[in-house]
Each structure stands twice: as C-alpha cells, then as structure tokens.
C-alpha cells in the first residue's frame, strides 16, 4: 500500500514540474521576443533620426548652393555690364571717327563741286565742262559703288548673324521641346507608378490591419485561456498538496495501527480492512482524476506551443513583408533622387535660358539706345516739315532717280555735242528731222550701241548726199535713177535696223513713244532733275552739317528690322520661360507630394511592424492614425 501511494504521489509531481518548465520556457521566449521587438523599435528610431539628419544636411547644402549661385549670377552680371560699357564706348568712338571721316570726305566733295560750279558759272569752254562733268560723274559713281559694296557686305554680315541667331534659337527651342516632352513622359510614368504603389500599399495595409486585428483577438483569447489554465494549475497544485498531506496522515495512521493488529479482536480487524479498502478506492479515484487533469493540461500546453509557433511564423512573415516593402520603397527613393537630379537639370537649363534672355534684353536695350542716340543726332526739320519716314523714303527715291537721270544727262550731253558739231559743219542748213532726234535720244542708251551708229550714218548720208528719204528736203534733180535706188536700199536697211532698235527700246521702256511725247518727257525730266538735284544738295548739306551719311537710312531700316526680330524673339522666349517655370513649379509640387507620401509610407510600415510585433502598443490610436 505504501509503495503504491508513493508511486502515485511521484507521478503528479513530475507532471507539474514539466508543466512549470514549459511555462517558464514560454515566458522566456516571450521576454526574448519583447526584447527583440524593443531592439527593432530602437533601430527604426535611429534610422528615422538618420533620415531626418540627411534631409537637414541636404536642405543646408541646397541653401548653400543657391546662395553661391546667386553670388555667381551677381558677379557675372557685373562683369557683363562692365564689358558692355567698354564695348559701347569703343563703338561710340569708332562711330565718331567714321562720322568725322565721312564729314571730311563730303566737305572735300562739296568744295570740288563748288569749284566746278564756279567754273561752269564763269562760262568756261564746253570741253572743260564735259571733262569736269565726266570726272564728277566718275567720282560719284566710284563713291556710290564703294558705298554700295560696303552696304552689301554689311547686309550679308547681318544676314549671316541673323541666320546664326535663328539657328541657335531653333536649336534651343527644339531642345526645350524635347526636354519638356521627356519631363512630361517621366512625370506621367512617375505619377502612374505612384498611383500603383499607393493602391498596392493601401491594399497591403488593409490586409495587414485585418490580420493584426485577428491576431490581437487570438492573443486576447490565448491570454484568457492561459489565465484560466494558470488558475487550474494552481488549484491542482493545492489539491495535490492536500492529497499529499492526507496520504502522509494515512501512512502514519497505518504505521501506528499495524503493530497491535494481532491483539485486536476479529471485529476490529474486519473494520480496519474495510476502512483500508475504502481508502485505497478513494486514492485510485483521485489518481485517475489527477491523471486526467494532467493530460488535459498537457494537451492545453501543446496547443499553446502550437499557437506560439504559429505566431512566431506569422511574425517572421510580417518581418519578411516589411523587408519586401522596404525593397519596394528603394526604387521609389531612387526615383525621387532621379527626379531631384532632373529638377536640378531643369533649374540649370532655366538659368541658361534666363541668361540668354538677359543677354537678348541687354542687346535690345543697346539697340534702342543706339537708335535713340542716332535719332537725337539725326533729328532735323525738312524743307516742308515732313516726317522722318517720308524723308527717308524721299531720299531713297531721289537716289534711284539720280542714278536713272545720270544716264539721261550723259545721253543729253553727247547729243548736245553732236548737234553742235553738225551745226558747225552745216551752218545755216535745215535742222535734222524729229526722227533723228528720237533715234539719237534713245540710240545713245548704254545698252543699244548699234542704233547710235546707225543713226549717225543715216544723219551723215542725209547731210552729204541729200537723199529723198525725208519729205521736208528738196530732191536733187541731177541724181540718177541708179543712185536713187542704191540710196533707197541703204535707207530701207537703216530703217529696218532702226525699227529693230525701236522695238528693243519699247520692250525696255514698256510702251510706245513718239517725238512730241519724247520732247515733253525730256523737258519734264530736266525740270525734275534740277528740282531733285536741288533737293539732294539741300539734304546733303543738312547731312554734312549733322555729320551723318546717306547710308544712315539703310542702317536705320536694318536696325529697325533687327530690333523687331529681337522683340519677337524676346516675346517667344518669355512665353517659353513662363511655360518652363509653370512646369518646374508643378514638378516641385509633385516632388514634395512624393516625399510626403514616402514619409507616410515609412510611418505606416513602422506602425505595421509595431502592431505585428507588439504587446506594448495600443491598437485604437494607431488605427485612427492610419
């Protein structure tokens, strides 16, 4: 009996010891998990502090760079202004030198022309007049050709400069368009990626929150069960101690009553046997009940261990997911860095465009100042109080008329010399017919030399031979029929040649001409020539007094055209600059939103990790924050 009771008492002790050991192991594991969770929490806090420090350092560097860039801009502006001032002074000096040189040249020409005019007024010989006229014409022609070549060269240079500026502007516009298209594409891709990541993160957050809620409910249920089981184990231990005490008492009683058993009467022995059987039966039932309870506790402990392993697996899965989210956030961080680099490139390009715009505005201001200075120097009152534009147009028109009428003057001078020679030879003979005048007037054109020779031959034949070609002259009755036929054939050939020359002249002039119209046009042209020469002399005197040249008109027109082109370019560049500034502002706003979103995702990730690991964090405030 004592051996059986001892063996039955040792079995519950071993089982309760194993239960206590398992509980202690579970508590040690729980403390280790909490320690690891606290370590991870401290690591996350340190990483967040490092991130904040890195952001502060980046902001400080950005401010330092912006201050340095502003200083460089100020220095560059000062240097440019100094260079432009020096260039402006050099150009002003050069312009003054050229104006003085042209004034000297014009004064010399005026003196020479005045001398020739005095000679003409004094009544010099015709040969001297023609020589002086030819010299003056040749010199004027040479000066005009030189001026024209110089102006053509300047026009070609300005065209080349304009072409280069247009090419640079087109290249700049194409590059800006390409950059804008790349930025739009990158912005759209970035926006799509952000929306996709946002949807995935929200989906994962909802799923993780649902899982966290379920895990929390499971943890609460397990804690309740653990408390119930701890109470049951405590109660079982108390029952075990009570049973041990009862067993000890029973054993002591058996030991005390075992020696006088023989001396007892038989009735008393039967009673003792009955009592011993009842005690043994009670011990067996208690042992079975304890064994059942221990088996139940073992099953509960196994269930708790299984749930603990499941929770550990879920924790590992959550850690893996947190690492995966960190890996997914790395491309976003890299994209953010790339966007920052693109923003910096855009800032540099905008700065370059601003510098170009400033240079163009400075050039425009210089051109305006130059035009205003020239206008102030060249501002004068015309003879009829005409405006400056009408004076310019009149000067251009008069220049063309002078070029056309110089040829007419040459023709008239040659015709006058020929008529003087013919008058000397003929004396009091008849005047040449109007046909010869018409032929000679148009025959001495620079482009029809054949008509000139033919008219001279026809005039000579008319003067010497007295042919019957003109009805105004009397026919010689002594001439023979053969001579008349020969002269008639010669005159018909000359007449056909003159018709061909006249047709060519009609093609050149563009209309039909007769002698009376020619005389009227000649008189009108002479009057116009004198009037234009007077106007030209007046204008040249005014220009010489002002120290300017006739090329000022063309220069001013070219400058006005270039100024208009520059204004249009400046307007286009301002529009492009405003567009780029708006795009830059949109990109900055988007970058700030992305940074805020990244921080939000980091906070959510840290909250998810804490909620998945955590026993020390309340659930409801974090849920409200999410």
From Swiss-Prot:
GO CC annotations on file: cytoplasm; membrane; microtubule; microtubule cytoskeleton; ribonucleoprotein complex
Compartment(s) where it occurs, according to its Swiss-Prot or TrEMBL record: Cytoplasm, Cytoskeleton; Membrane
Polar residues bias locations: 452-461
Span list, region Mediates association with microtubules: 1-365
Keywords: Coiled coil, Cytoplasm, Cytoskeleton, Membrane, Microtubule, Phosphoprotein, Protein transport, Transport
Modified residues (Phosphoserine): 382
Record PTM text: Phosphorylated.
A matching Pfam family: JAKMIP_CC3
Family: Belongs to the JAKMIP family.
Function: Associates with microtubules and may play a role in the microtubule-dependent transport of the GABA-B receptor. May play a role in JAK1 signaling and regulate microtubule cytoskeleton rearrangements.
Subunit note: Homodimer. Interacts with JAK1 and TYK2. Forms a complex with GABBR1 and KIF5B/kinesin-1.
Protein name, as recorded: Janus kinase and microtubule-interacting protein 1
Organism: Rattus norvegicus
Upper lineage: Eukaryota, Metazoa, Chordata, Craniata, Vertebrata
